[in-house]
């Protein structure tokens, strides 16, 4: 409804404005000491002792941020602008979510497990990350070339992206635990 009434840009500005009002309400009305923790001794306490965990955490922030931008704003707007009805867009996103979960559950069967828990898994994470980086670039080229049946080509590309993303996410989750070792 918001897109139909205000359009895309104005809708984003309206949502940003409403979130700003919520933030202002939190600042004004939430008690000052609520949720306040003890001051940390240094900024180093925010990070794990293991560099692998810190790198994976940074990668996950970027991965999930990219996924959320695509699937909260970009994909629904693209599909709706391509003539898909709301139920079709919602159905696609529902199937996407179910498929994503199925791939994540199957991911341990795709990545061979090594005795040390890292020697096979780290290269696998690099491989799946590279694939994940290539797919959006390929999709951008396809959109630029304006191929016939563009929305279906994009949907297929998003399927490949989702598959790679789900495997990547699963491998990253495993590696965080593997790197943590006794810190679990």
Per-segment meaning from a language model:
Residues 3, 102-122, 143:
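Helix-to-loop junctions at the C-terminal end of transmembrane segments
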Residues 3-17, 149:
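A membrane-interface helix-boundary motif in multi-pass transporters
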Residues 10-13, 80-99, 121-128, 152-153:
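Loop-to-transmembrane helix entry
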Residues 16-37:
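C-terminal membrane-cytosol helix-exit motif in multi-pass small-molecule transporters
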Residues 52-97:
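Helix-loop boundary and gating motifs at the non-cytosolic
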Residues 65-70, 102, 163-171:
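Hydrophobic transmembrane alpha-helices of Major Facilitator Superfamily
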Residues 77, 169-180:
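Intracellular helix-loop hinge segments at the cytoplasmic ends of transmembrane helices
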Residues 121-172:
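C-terminal transmembrane helical hairpin of 12-TM major facilitator-type secondary transporters
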């Amino acid at each position: 409804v918001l897109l139909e009434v205000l359009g895309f840009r104005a809708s984003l500005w309206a949502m940003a404005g409403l979130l700003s009002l919520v933030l202002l309400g939190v600042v004004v009305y939430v008690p000052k000491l609520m949720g306040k923790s003890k001051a940390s001794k240094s900024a180093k306490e925010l990070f794990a002792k293991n560099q692998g965990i810190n790198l994976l955490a940074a990668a996950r922030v970027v991965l999930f941020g990219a996924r959320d931008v695509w699937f909260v704003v970009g994909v629904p707007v693209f599909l709706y602008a391509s003539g898909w009805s709301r139920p079709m867009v919602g159905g696609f996103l529902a199937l996407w979510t179910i498929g994503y979960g199925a791939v994540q559950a199957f991911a341990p069967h795709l990545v061979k497990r090594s005795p040390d828990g890292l020697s096979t898994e780290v290269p696998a994470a690099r491989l799946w990350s590279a694939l994940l980086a290539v797919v959006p670039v390929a999709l951008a080229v396809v959109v630029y070339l304006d191929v016939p049946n563009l929305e279906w080509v994009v949907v297929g590309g998003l399927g490949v992206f989702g598959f790679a993303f789900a495997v990547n996410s699963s491998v990253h989750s495993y590696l965080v635990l593997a790197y943590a070792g006794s810190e679990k």
